[in-house]
């Protein structure tokens, strides 16, 4: 079928009438559908969506049903229409005067600048204010429509909006730069939520105009002037040159402009932002007096969102400094939520993140932030040349402390790989393999963090023994990192059943999900997280919302890849194996925490606090034991199997002496057994509460663990106590 015939068929289905309301017609093959063919049918589709589906709510109309089906196929294919001049004229003639929202949605689909006839239609649409009145927040849409309508005299628009925004000087100054912007920048601002922005952690798939604005020279210059002036005003406030009034330094509208300027500068990693962001963020968080107020809550929160979304080493450090000094409880709580996501997002800008090692002291906080950033290199493409690896990591103070405890993999120009760890002693660097032997790598090698999935079982075990033998605690779990391989059935589809069927408690699920960077899906039935250009959606049969206390069964894990500005389902087999492994590991963590309750005093105390009724407390305790009994009979998951492997290495000597045995699910010491997945303790098959006493003296040997995990630590403590 030709493109012209396919477009005609789509238009016929969207506009024709049927003899029966359940008419569906012959299936249509969309395998040849492209952007231009879709553009030819776009006016008919939009007409069906607005005039039939929205206005008449015609759920029994075949045209509406076909429009829903076609929209779903378009989204699945990731297609964006390209509308030519004739179709564009038809498209915009359907729009009523004042229909700004609809016009702004379709303007990005034009394949060329508007013709004079189309400009006249756009002028007609823009001639009446949206919703019948001038609204300050609609300025971006008005300017965009005027630009595409061929109007270049914005003076009347500017005067009307300046009057409405008289209390927000930064918004008024932004009006003066709007006529200098190109069409892409204007559309990006118009497509935003009236200029307001929040990170994806709060609004799923909210577009940030800063990315487009960063390519527009006029807005970049405006961003520099805006941040410089904002910093000057804050400095004057703290110097006493301006009287202090709590929360009056910047209006809510101005806060959005200043924060957007910060995101533009951060996206470009402008050098002039580095000395500005610290004093600005701290200055709007802390009153110049001893009061527990803030000069501007709105700007403090907006800058926190900016740092979380597009971080730089300097802005993350500024966020830490602000958290250490802020006295306003509400602002402190908001900014604290930005810190972990900011560190994680900084890892997705690896070359920007590594700047922190050049001038930073190797303190614990700096090392923790570097570790968080570098861990993102497992799912974000990150390789360094040999010279850059030496400069940014091995030879830098903060970088050396990190790199000397991590395993690295070098790939030469011939494709050969070599894994090694740097041994840094008195400034001398020797590269050593898993056996401890010195090795050499070529100067033209590319270096990345070693991942257990990239090597065979013998090499994994060799590095694990090396880490245990040196009692080395790695900043990022690496040698003992869990890895996941999709099944053959999953490789050809975009969803996996790997974690399906677990009963999850929503409260711990949402707690760990938020900490790890997941967001609640728009339909409240799943969690979403991005891993570079891969997006994972983990579905749960429960309504998820902050504070929910329900239970639900886990469903499938869906993966998508970014296609321009859309997400398109991708076969798992086409995703980088390490990236999928990291996605699965993140989901396994959710399942492990929400399905396997840690059987400790804190958990029991929290459950007991829910009621003072002795009968109810007894029921809670019985339910807890029944749940642990059920979980103890399940096959071990990947994390539990990994935990069992670590236990075999940590207790290698008692195992060799016959004091401990480790079977499929349990660690056994005489009549006692401890389950590797739940920590459940039994004696001769009867469940017991194992009381772990503190070490009687500092001389008591405490088993060393290669990484931190609460349940693993509990199992080790119980087993060590039983051995004594």
What does each model-found stretch correspond to?
Residues 1-311, 316, 323-724:
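Non-catalytic terminal/accessory regions
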């Amino acid at each position: 079928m030709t493109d012209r015939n396919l477009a005609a068929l789509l238009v016929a289905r969207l506009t024709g009438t049927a003899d029966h309301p359940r008419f569906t017609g012959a299936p249509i093959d969309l395998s040849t559908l492209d952007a231009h063919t879709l553009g030819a049918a776009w006016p008919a589709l939009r007409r069906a969506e607005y005039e039939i589906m929205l206005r008449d709510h015609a759920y029994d109309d075949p045209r509406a049903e076909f429009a829903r089906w076609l929209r779903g196929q378009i989204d699945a294919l990731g297609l964006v229409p390209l509308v030519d001049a004739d179709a564009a004229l038809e498209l915009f003639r359907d729009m009523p005067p004042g229909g700004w929202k609809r016009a702004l949605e379709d303007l990005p689909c034009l394949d060329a600048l508007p013709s004079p006839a189309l400009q006249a239609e756009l002028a007609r649409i823009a001639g009446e204010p949206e919703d019948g009145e001038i609204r300050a927040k609609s300025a971006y849409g008005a300017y965009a429509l005027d630009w595409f309508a061929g109007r270049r005299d914005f003076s009347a628009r500017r005067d009307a909006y300046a009057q409405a925004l008289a209390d927000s000087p930064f918004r008024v100054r932004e009006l003066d730069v709007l006529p200098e912007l190109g069409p892409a920048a204007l559309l990006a601002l118009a497509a935003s939520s009236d200029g307001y922005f929040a990170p994806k952690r709060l609004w799923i798939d909210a577009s940030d105009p800063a990315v487009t604005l960063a390519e527009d020279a006029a807005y970049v210059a405006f961003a520099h002037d805006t941040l410089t002036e904002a910093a000057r005003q804050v400095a004057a406030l703290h110097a006493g040159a301006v009287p202090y009034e709590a929360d009056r330094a910047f209006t809510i509208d101005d806060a959005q402009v200043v924060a957007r300027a910060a995101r533009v500068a951060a996206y470009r990693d402008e050098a002039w932002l580095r000395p500005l962001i610290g004093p600005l963020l701290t200055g709007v968080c802390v009153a110049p007096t001893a009061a527990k107020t803030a000069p501007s809550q709105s700007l403090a929160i907006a800058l926190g969102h900016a740092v979380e979304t597009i971080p730089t080493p300097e802005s993350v450090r500024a966020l830490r400094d602000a958290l250490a000094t802020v006295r306003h409880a509400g602002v402190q709580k908001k900014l604290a939520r930005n810190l972990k996501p900011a560190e994680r997002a900084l890892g997705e800008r690896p070359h920007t993140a590594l700047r922190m090692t050049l001038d930073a002291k190797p303190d614990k906080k700096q090392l923790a932030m570097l570790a968080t950033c570098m861990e993102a290199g497992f799912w974000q493409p990150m390789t360094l040349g040999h010279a850059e690896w030496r400069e940014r990591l091995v030879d830098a103070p903060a970088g050396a402390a990190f790199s000397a405890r991590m395993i690295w993999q070098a790939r030469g120009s011939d494709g050969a790989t070599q894994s090694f760890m740097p041994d840094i002693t008195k400034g001398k660097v020797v590269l050593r393999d898993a056996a401890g032997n010195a090795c050499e790598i070529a100067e033209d090698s590319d270096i990345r963090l070693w991942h257990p999935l990239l090597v065979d079982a013998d090499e994994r075990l060799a590095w694990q023994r090396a880490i245990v033998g040196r009692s080395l605690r790695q900043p990022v779990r690496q040698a003992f990192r869990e890895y996941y391989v999709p099944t053959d059935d999953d490789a050809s589809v975009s969803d996996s059943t790997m974690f399906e069927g677990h009963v999850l408690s929503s409260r711990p699920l949402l707690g760990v999900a938020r900490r790890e960077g997941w967001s609640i899906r728009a339909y409240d039935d799943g969690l979403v997280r991005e891993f570079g250009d891969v997006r994972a959606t983990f579905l749960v049969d429960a309504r998820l919302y902050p504070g929910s206390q329900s239970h639900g069964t886990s469903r499938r894990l869906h993966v998508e890849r970014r296609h321009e500005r859309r997400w398109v389902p991708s076969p798992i087999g086409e995703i980088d194996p390490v990236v999928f492994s990291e996605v699965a590991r993140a989901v396994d963590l959710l399942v492990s925490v929400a399905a396997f309750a840690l059987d400790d005093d804190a958990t029991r105390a929290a459950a007991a606090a829910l009621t003072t009724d002795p009968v109810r407390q007894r029921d809670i305790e019985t339910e807890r034991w029944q749940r642990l009994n059920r979980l103890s009979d399940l096959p071990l998951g990947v994390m539990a199997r990994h935990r069992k492997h670590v236990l075999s290495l940590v207790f290698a000597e008692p195992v060799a002496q016959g004091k401990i045995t480790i079977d499929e699910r349990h660690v056994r010491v005489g009549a006692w057994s401890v389950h590797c997945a739940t920590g459940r303790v039994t004696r001769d098959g009867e469940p017991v509460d194992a009381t772990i006493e503190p070490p009687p003296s500092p001389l008591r040997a405490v088993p060393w663990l290669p990484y931190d995990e609460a349940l693993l630590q509990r199992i080790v403590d119980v087993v060590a106590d039983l051995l004594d």
